[in-house]
UniProtKB/Swiss-Prot annotation:
The UniProt record lists the keyword ATP-binding: no
Protein name: Large ribosomal subunit protein bL35
Name of encoding gene: rpmI
Upper taxonomic lineage: Bacteria, Pseudomonadati, Pseudomonadota, Alphaproteobacteria, Rhodospirillales
Molecular function per GO: structural constituent of ribosome
Organism: Paramagnetospirillum magneticum (strain ATCC 700264 / AMB-1) (Magnetospirillum magneticum)
One Pfam family this sequence matches: Ribosomal_L35p
Amino acid sequence: MPKMKTKSSAKKRFKLTGTGKVKGNVAFKRHCLSAKSQKMKRQARGTFMLFKTDSDNVKKYFLPNGG
């Protein structure tokens, strides 16, 4: 059976850290920013770590070869 391909959409959205955790971007920061509070915009900067259950699914189904 051939290797599973990495999903192209997941390659663009997630990165694997050295310890095997999955890092992603925070949502809700592209447009309509005037309606959002300063706190929400500030907290949406940078990246966040996925929870273990979510990261297990991402690694199994979307990044089988490590991204």
